[in-house]
Amino acid sequence: MGPFRTKPPSGHRPYLVAHRGISGKAPENTLAAFGLACETAGIDMIELDVRLSSDNEVVVLHDRTLQRTSTGNGAARNYSVSEMKEFDAGSWFHPSFAAERIPTLREVLKLVDKRLWLNIELKSDFFFPEKSGTLEGRVLETVRELHYEQHVMYSSFNHRMLATMKRLCPTAVTGVLFSVARDYGRMPSKLAERVGAEVFVCAKREVSRRVVDDARNAGLAVYVYTLNSVTNAAKMIEMGVDGILSDSADEIVHYVKRPGV
């Protein structure tokens, strides 16, 4: 893939983003799920979640705790990477994935190898508040080490983390994730302006013509999650969104990328 651009060229189809990889066919946020995304023609980007281990390594994991998606238990922040690697991160999905382990961001970057862009969601932890800039800084170090700077965007519900990312790397592309509880009634332009973001990311239920028009007028791209059916994808394409996040990107790619869309 060439350098990341927040919007597809005028007249082109919206970006298709594999949400936590092809998480409908393989356990989310694993190398298996990301590998499937890389092998599926028509997918543009992978979305993944990152947080820190106890030894300050960047690991790819959605939840604060381990038990939903691995044989581990308790807060991920209490374990080192080597300790996490002891846990089975695939059997919960299907026994055939028992060999899957919680990957590090470095492992994912090496696997994807610029075949797809990445949307790295920065996760914050209320119970383990990070020293300002710790996760953001470690992510940037890894991305720079593997020369992925031009192939990635960063998103977060924690908009302070996005502001920190911009401070550490002014050229970083960021996306504000919309939280109903916190941001209800606020328009994309205002949320993005506060942290200098280029992308507005929200759930499908939050999308309206008013929201899309406001984002457009502010020059923002609009990405929507989580669209797992052709019906939902069709509605968002009609609204003019720029990116579609899906657990089943492999199943809707034929529609999203069909000629004429």
In which residue ranges do the predicted regions lie?
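Phosphate-group recognition and catalysis centered on beta-loop-alpha active-site segments
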Residues: 1-261
